[in-house]
Regions:
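Metal-dependent nuclease catalytic cores in nucleic-acid-processing enzymes
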Residues: 1-15
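Long, charged, mostly alpha-helical binding arms that flank functional sites
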Residues: 16-186
Length: 186
């Protein structure tokens, strides 16, 4: 298989192992769990999926839909849902932040960052959630569980960051002057 071929080629060229660990996905099946086949007409053109949904959405769908070692039921509607729900939410959240950061001239390198004392309860909550996410994702990757890591990131972006933090803090960004509270929100 290609694992051995790539490993052997790299070892011959470089004199070292190409990789120490490999995570491989199972078969990619159609949305009903059947083997894809041109003859049956249920095969998905990978280049068409990439053109329609984008590489990031296809990769994120494949990562978060099932563990890599399990067979994956590929559903184009699922890829579109990932594109809308995860990437759309991430894009809109970043767009909201960038709009107000640019209006306020905030770059993140301001010498007078808000002190932790200025952080509101919700600021401390989102920072706690972020630090917990970092720990959870790191542990998942170290345990070779990328699906668990991806799902945790999706949940954080869609629920904690967008649905709670941004929605409850919009007025802090709308304020006219840069005060400690607004600085803490950034």
């Amino acid at each position: 298989g290609w694992f051995f071929t790539l490993h052997a080629i790299h070892t011959m060229i470089e004199g070292t192992v190409a990789y120490k660990n490999v995570i491989s996905n199972g078969l990619v099946l159609d949305k009903n769990g059947n083997k894809m086949s041109k003859r049956l007409g249920n095969a998905v053109d990978p280049f068409g999926a990439l053109d329609t949904y984008g590489a990031d959405a296809v990769r994120w769908y494949m990562l978060t839909n099932s563990s890599p070692w399990e067979n994956l039921k590929f559903d184009p509607e699922g890829v579109d849902e990932v594109r809308r729900k995860f990437f759309g939410t991430l894009y809109n959240t970043y767009g909201f932040f960038a709009l107000y950061a640019n209006v306020d001239g905030w770059t993140g390198s301001e010498p007078e960052q808000a002190s932790h004392a200025a952080y509101s309860e919700i600021d401390r909550w989102i920072l706690s959630k972020l630090n917990s996410l970092i720990k959870e994702v790191t542990e998942a990757y170290e345990a070779y569980e990328p699906t668990k890591a991806g799902r945790a990131i999706s949940d954080f972006v869609q629920d904690d960051l967008s649905n709670w933090y941004v929605r409850l803090n919009r007025k802090r960004f709308w304020g006219g002057e840069m005060n400690a509270d607004k600085q803490a929100a950034y």
